[in-house]
Structure formats: C-alpha cells, structure tokens
C-alpha cells in the first residue's frame, strides 16, 4: 500500500492556497499540483511550493488519487461529481454543495463509486471542541452566535450556508435526535443574499437550539453555550477555549475542576465545579486534511462524511426557504 496519496487542489484563492501549503507539510500527502481558472494564481502558488500548475481539471485528475475542492460553492457539485466518477477521493470545503439535491447526488455517487468524501466542517477540529471529547454531552438548550465582519468572499451564498452551517453541523453532532421544527428569519443588507439570520431548531427529545449568524457585524464573535441537566458548557471558537460548569449531587462525588462551593440544601444540594479542559494545540485545517488522507489510506469512513453534510444541508435549506417565504409575504 502506498504511504502517500497523490493529491491536487482545485481553487487557489485565499483558502485554497492555505490548503496547498498545509498539504505540502502533511506526511501522507504528495501534493502534485493545483488548478484554478485564474492561471496566474495557480502559477504563483505552484511556483512557491514547487508543484505543477495544471491547465485543466482533467489534467489534474489524471495525475492524482485525491483532490481538495476549494472552488466557489456553485461549482462544488460539478467538480466533485466529475472527479468521483473518475475514481478520485474528494475533500470538499463546506458547504458541500449549493443545494440539497446536489448533496444527495454527491452521496449517491460516492457510494456507487466507492470513493471517500470528506466535507470541511472545520469547527469539529477546533481545539475547544476537541477539549470536550472526554465529556458526555447531552445539551437541551444551545445558544450560538457566529458574527463576522463583511468580506466579499463567500457572498455567492446566504450567510446560512456561509457561516451558520458550522453551528448546524456541531449541533446535529451534539444533539442525537431528529429535528421536529425550524423557525427562521433573516435579511440581506449588503449582498443580494441573506447577510444576517436567526434560526430556532427544535428536536424530538425536547432540545432547542437558537442560532444567530451575521457577516455584517462590527465585532466578530464565534461562541456557543450549551445547557444540560448537570451543567453548562461554553465554547469560544476564536480563542480555542472551552469552559465547563457542573452542578453535581454531593453523594455522587465531586468531579474534577475548581470547587466553587455548594448551592441549595437537603436533597436539592449541588456541588458546583469549574473546569477549563486542556485544549490540544493543533492546526484544525491541517488535522482534517490529515484525517481525510488517513481514511483513504486505511479505507475507513471519513470523519465528516457526505451523508453527515447532507443532513446539515437539509436543515440549512429549510432555514433559507423559510427566510425567502417570509420575504415574499412582506412584499405582498
């Protein structure tokens, strides 16, 4: 078995260049080249890394076993479908596609062609999220704020697909229950699509998630707060820090962390503790690329599969459609 996978990058804008530079550092990757419709961009990064600037997608495909697709969302499906049918494993940046129908087709092709697909939901690999891996997470109420300053990149899709998908993916991963209802609102301020959105998602087990995403905010914020029966968990994605507060019955023993004292009396007494679990010092993007290549080499499932990404798209699509319907009603 080869110990390195021949891989190429399609789309070398800001993020695509980062993919290429990191793949050059990954031991299991043999970065053979890049392709971009902007020939100058491709040649510049290729020269920097000492790889080839391919003249077409077909030329790149013929020289690779796997491809990292970092092109605009609108062409994800076209590129991935074409490459998978040629037997190429695909890492696809989020969102997986521009529509649910396209995402369904990606899943079908991947299964039929027996190729690996991993989708770039990078917050799964945020140090703060990794720091919580030892905890049993059963959140019943989740509050998310993902606010960013305006940048012209990514405005071809609504903020729901650009930013909110990160939180949708995490919530579906944390709350092991089916979605029962979604209530959403949003508005376009600068772009022709939705720039700020809020969604309230209810689950069959009674859990509720409230998500707000904006790409027109003055002060950036990427935070999630989760409340469950025995405690409260706060995640600061930007700082890579997780904080855990627990309220435990004294007879069950005091969990690790700083003891903040006891609240309540009698049967209602609870010991309150605080912990800031150690977060691993990792490059999240490099880690997800390494895991993708590991799944190709070992023929194991990818950590964020096309089927998981499809579930995210179904929720995101419902949110976008609700917002569009409310806009139609307002225009009557």
Task: Indicate residue ranges for each PLM-predicted region.
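C-terminal helix-rich "cap/oligomerization" subdomain common to oxidoreductases
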Residues: 1, 66-69, 291-332
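Hydrophobic residues in well-ordered beta-strands that form the structural core
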Residues: 55, 92, 117-119, 143, ...
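A contiguous active-site-proximal alpha/beta segment in oxidoreductase catalytic domains
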Residues: 97-154
């Amino acid at each position: 078995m080869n110990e390195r996978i021949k891989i190429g990058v399609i789309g070398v804008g800001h993020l695509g260049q980062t993919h290429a530079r990191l793949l050059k550092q990954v031991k299991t990757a043999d970065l053979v080249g890049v392709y971009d419709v902007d020939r100058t961009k491709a040649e510049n990064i290729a020269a920097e890394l000492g790889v080839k600037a391919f003249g077409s997608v077909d030329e790149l495909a013929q020289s690779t076993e796997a491809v990292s697709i970092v092109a605009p969302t609108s062409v994800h499906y076209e590129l991935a479908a074409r490459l998978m049918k040629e037997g190429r494993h695909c890492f696809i940046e989020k969102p997986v596609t521009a529509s649910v129908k396209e995402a369904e087709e990606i899943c079908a092709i991947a299964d039929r062609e027996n190729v690996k697909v991993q989708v770039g939901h990078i917050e799964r690999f945020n140090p703060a999220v990794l720091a919580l891996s030892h905890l049993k997470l059963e959140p019943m109420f989740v509050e998310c704020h993902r606010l960013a300053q305006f940048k012209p990149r990514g405005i071809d899709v609504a903020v729901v697909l650009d930013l909110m998908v990160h939180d949708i993916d995490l919530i579906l991963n944390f709350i092991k229950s089916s979605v029962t209802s979604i209530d959403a609102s949003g508005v376009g301020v600068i772009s022709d699509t939705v720039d700020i959105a809020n969604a309230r998602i209810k689950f069959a087990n009674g859990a509720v998630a409230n998500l707000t995403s904006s790409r027109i905010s003055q002060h950036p914020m990427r935070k999630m707060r989760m409340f469950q029966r025995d405690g409260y968990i706060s995640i600061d994605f930007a700082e890579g820090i997780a904080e855990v507060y627990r309220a435990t019955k004294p007879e069950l023993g005091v969990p690790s962390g700083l003891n903040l004292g006891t609240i309540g009396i009698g049967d209602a007494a609870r010991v309150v503790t605080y912990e800031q679990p150690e977060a691993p010092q990792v490059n999240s993007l490099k880690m997800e690329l390494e895991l993708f290549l590991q799944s190709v080499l070992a023929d194991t499932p990818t950590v964020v599969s096309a089927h998981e990404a499809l579930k995210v798209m179904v929720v995101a699509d419902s949110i976008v459609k609700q917002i569009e319907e409310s806009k139609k009603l307002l225009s009557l």
